[in-house]
C-alpha cells in the first residue's frame, strides 16, 4: 500500500491503492473466448478517499474494445466487497444478454460479485502485495494480496 501522497493543496492524505489492472497481454488472454461483457469496478480502496472515478475501468474498456468484444455495460460501485450494499446495487444493474462479468477490484470484490451472478466472473486486476487489511467485507472471504490474482 502506498502511503502519504501529497494532496493537490499540499496536505498529506493516505493512498489506499489495493489493486491495479492486469497487464494487457494477460487481459487479452483472459478475454479470449468471451464476449458480451459487463465490467464492474470498485470505486474505493483504489486511491485516496475522494470523490473521483476509478481510473482502470476506462483503460480496461479501451482494451476490451480493441479486442473486438461487446461491452453490455459498466458500473463503478463504492466498496464492492460490501455484500449487502453490492447485492442491492447489482440487482438490476447487469443487462440481459451479458455472458461474462469482469471485475476490477481486489480479490474480495471478485468473490463478492461471483457469489451474486449466474455468469462466469473474471478478475481484471491484481491486488497489490502489502501487509494490512483488504476491503470492508463483513464475511469470511479474504484476499491474500498476492499481487497475481489467481481467481480466474
Range-by-range predicted roles:
Residues 2-152:
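Iron-sulfur-associated redox domains of electron-transfer enzymes in respiratory
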